[in-house]
Amino acid sequence: MNKPTKWKTQKEAFVESLSYLEGRKKGKITSIKTPWQSFNNATTDGIEWHSTTVIGARPATGKTLIKDLLVNGAFKLNPLMNFRVLEFQFEMLGKNSAIREYSGHLQKSYKYLCSADGQLTDEDFEKCRVYAKDKLKYPIDVVEEPCNMIEFREIVQEYMNLHSSVNEEGKRLYKNTIITLDHSLLLKRSPGEKDKFDMLYTLGETLTALKRKYPIAFIVLSQLNRSIDAPERNEDGKYGNFILESDIMGADALLQHADTLIGLNRPGKQKIKYYGVERYIVDGDPTILAMHFIKCR
């Protein structure tokens, strides 16, 4: 038997591409629909498998909420898809993350739900219980313990192998899996990584290696650089109002590995009335969320 080579022929690549196009044409291969039509239109009708989506925003802008809406929407809007979700949540405990989900769903404050701002009513507690019961129907697992990139790769590989099967021909079949990473900078540095930028470069390379091998859709949340808060960036009607590629923390490390790069902004929190050179009317409303599609592969 000939030893496998590290390359494939051009014919193999074209055959694979035609098979993929035929699968999409017949509806056998579909993207993960999101709750926003503008998101679906900007991408390939949603999030594709074997891809990485990076979402960057200031703290308290709502990137975790958007991630939760993407995950919940994936189950509700794609009922015929068979997939799992693995969430890496290092910022807070799972119970605290769940309470934040209740907060977003009920439009009630975290303090109120914890009876620290008036006692939680029986009615609202019941709404939380119903939400939790509905969410528990979905196959979602959570990693709370911070890890470095070596451990991250091992966890993902173990998870994908655990939820795989072998067909009659002896080929291993992996289950489609959405993997979220809440706050990429909370990963620990591995030996040999000098700083957070080294870690982000390793993260990008690891995500690419994993998404090539497994049917994974990564959703990675990232912070922004402090330059976004420069006073001139928050003057009305300026191009700098928008989230730019260079604003993403570790953009050089993550951009080349991301299939989709999104910047979230709440211009009203910076007291902006007219957003960007198009002068979109925001009028200082902090509830308006702008979603910038910086890169769509």
What does each model-found stretch correspond to?
Residues 2-108:
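The Walker A/P-loop phosphate-binding site
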Residues 19, 34, 43, 77-174:
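Cytosolic-facing regulatory segments adjacent to core modules
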Residues 33-36, 95, 122-125, 129, ...:
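Amphipathic alpha-helical transducer elements in NTP-driven molecular machines
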Residues 86, 169-208, 217:
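Helical hairpin unit composed of two closely spaced alpha helices linked by a short loop
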Residues 93-99, 187-191, 227-232, 270-274:
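Switch/connector loops and helix/strand junctions flanking conserved nucleotide-binding motifs
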Residues 113-118, 141-144, 189-199, 232-244:
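Flexible beta-alpha connector loops of hexameric P-loop NTPases
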Residues 205-297:
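Phosphate-binding/switch region of NTP-binding enzymes
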